[in-house]
Structure formats: C-alpha cells, structure tokens
Amino acid sequence: MVSKTSLLEAVKAFDWKALNAGLKERPDLLSHREEREKNWLHVLCSTKLKGRKPAASIKTADVLLERGIDLHAHAFTEGTWKATPVWWCVSWGRNLSLAEHLLKLGATPDYSMFAACWNDDVAALDLLLKYGALVDDLTSARETPFLGAIAWSRFGYAEALLNRGADVNARSEKGLTAFHIMLKKGSNFEHFAMLAKHGARGDIPGTDGKTAIEIMSRKKDERFWKLAKRLGGAG
C-alpha cells in the first residue's frame, strides 16, 4: 500500500522506480510536505549520499519533476531568505552532482552561499558562482558571504572568496570590517596577514570610531604593531 511513509523511504533510498509507481498510484501525495515545509524534492536534496553514486538521486529528482514538483518551490523561509532545492543539496545533502543537475534545469543558485561557507565547501562555492551566484551576494542577508566566513572563522573559505573577487573591505550592517570582527574575536595573526595581502584597509572607522590600525597599535604582539604601521603607510 502506498503511503507517505513508503514514499519517504523511496525518496531517501533514491528508489526512483518505486517512487514513480507510488506517485502514479497516489498522485494526491505529490503535494505532501514534511517538517520545515519540505516537499519531496527538498527531502531528496537533503539526503546524504552515504557512499552511493549520485546518478540515482538525479533520476529520482527527474521523476519528481516529471510528476509535477516545482523546481522553484522553497521550504521554510527566514526573512527574504528561502530554503531552495539547491540550498538543501549544499547544506544538508552535500550532493553537488544533484545540485548542478538542478542548476542546469534552471534552479536558482541564490540563497546558498552561506551554506557553502558554513560547510567550508569551496567546490560548492565554485558551483554556485558558475551558475550565476554573486560573490558578494546580498540577496538574502545584510552582510556578504565573505564577512560571514570571517565571523564563522572559515578563513580558508574567506580567502577563496577573495581569490574570486569578493570585496575585502566590505562592511557589516554595523559598519565593521573584517579586521574589526577579527580583532573583536581575537583571531590569529596569520589571518590578519592574509587580509592585508589581499588589500584590506586598516583606516576604516568602526562603530566606535576606532580604526583597525589604532586597535592593532595597542596590541602586545609586535606583529600587529608592524602590520598597523604598514597599513598606515599604505592608507
């Protein structure tokens, strides 16, 4: 007997034949939503491969789309941000082959840059950029992915963004630069040196009017003094 449970099992197993037969028998279940407003495509995209080849997941997606699932439908939202199929692939399923298949069909690459950042997934970053995501994406957040990477200490991802054109001097909603955020967190010096290498300015005032140069100049670590002096000379 076809049920929501049996369809859920088929989707997670990438059993596209059972899924197709089940939806043929019970087309009324196509519109079912799981927790967090996930439709069957979102469930599929959030399912990890666990050693399986992605081809079956792609075929399962095709069955769902052929049966009428909307490629552009989202699950839950937070403000202007949307949990899209590609976001589920990037954030939970980590299935970039399926993500690219959906992107080729016209799925939006937006809303997924921070998910790639959280997972420190540069391959996902490159995939999203390939299909039109903005490196300094502000479509659903008030800060750029680069500042998100800095805030989450994803410094490798942050540098990957800089290498792909991100603005190293972007400011947060509160007017803070990456330098300000890192000084507040007490990040290791090597990350300051990395930002300086990419042209970060130290003369931009923060919310309290203090620049990164001023704050660095008061540090006990002489490496910060030297960097502050260098930034001051460049500014």
Locate predicted features:
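Ankyrin-repeat boundary/"N-cap" motif
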Residues: 2-7, 32-49, 74-88, 108-116, ...
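Ankyrin repeat A-helix N-terminal signature
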Residues: 9-14, 43-56, 84-95, 115-122, ...
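Conserved ankyrin/ankyrin-like repeat signature
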Residues: 18, 56, 60, 97-98, ...
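Leucine-rich solenoid repeat scaffolds
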Residues: 196, 201-235
